[in-house]
């Protein structure tokens, strides 16, 4: 089933704060400082962030991957901020601009989708051919989810500092032997943020340089890492 399918996560279209985290702000301030400034002064952060350029760059890179064949794109959650305004803009943007046809778009929900109202959640089906609210068993040995495996929520890894993400543990897959886990959520820029040779790969847009990656790449990388450990 791998063939030419692609995987990605955490697009965050129409989400100024995340665009600022990716250095698309128009002012010389960090994303967190900018957010604090806007909250303190009661101004909209979007006025200081080039969200449109952020979204267009990502979409342009994604569109280069579609060849008109049967290859699908699996999005492991967080297509927007989760607010109604952001969601509506993101869905329209995907519908209008994404080269992958609707039946080739698969969504595995992240926290920003799981928090949606029922009314807003149903909008996802207008743009995606499949919508999954739990980890996707992509093949016999590949699991795609928004969240890292449950064991990561129980560890002291940097991203889980203060256990602030514990509330999402119920959505995370349980790690099993001889399976590859592809996930997003952490916004790490490292595919192997939790270590090499453990069959866990971050496929978020930050790790993939603002585009998607072939699933086959991670299958091959997993084999390579295992051979290194022999």
Placement of each model-derived feature along the sequence:
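Core catalytic region of metal-dependent phosphoesterases/phosphodiesterases
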Residues: 2, 6-8, 13-138
């Amino acid at each position: 089933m791998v063939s030419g399918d692609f995987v990605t996560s955490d697009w965050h279209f129409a989400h100024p704060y995340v665009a600022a985290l990716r250095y698309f702000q128009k002012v010389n301030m960090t994303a967190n400082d900018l957010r604090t400034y806007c909250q303190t002064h009661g101004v909209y952060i979007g006025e200081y962030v080039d969200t449109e350029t952020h979204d267009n760059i990502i979409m342009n890179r994604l569109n280069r991957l579609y060849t008109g064949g049967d290859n699908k794109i699996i999005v492991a959650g967080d297509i927007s901020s989760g607010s109604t305004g952001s969601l509506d803009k993101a869905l329209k943007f995907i519908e209008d601009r994404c080269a992958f046809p609707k039946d080739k778009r698969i969504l595995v929900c992240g926290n920003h989708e799981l928090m949606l109202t029922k009314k807003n959640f149903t909008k996802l089906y207008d743009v995606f051919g499949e919508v999954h609210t739990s980890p996707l068993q992509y093949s016999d040995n590949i699991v795609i989810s928004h969240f890292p495996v449950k064991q990561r929520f129980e560890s002291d890894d940097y991203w889980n500092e203060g256990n602030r993400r514990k509330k999402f543990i119920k959505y995370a897959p349980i790690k099993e032997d001889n399976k590859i886990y592809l996930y997003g959520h952490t916004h790490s820029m490292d595919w192997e943020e939790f270590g090499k040779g453990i069959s866990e790969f971050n496929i978020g847009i930050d790790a993939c340089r603002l585009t998607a990656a072939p699933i086959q790449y991670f299958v091959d990388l997993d084999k390579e890492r295992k051979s290194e450990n022999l």
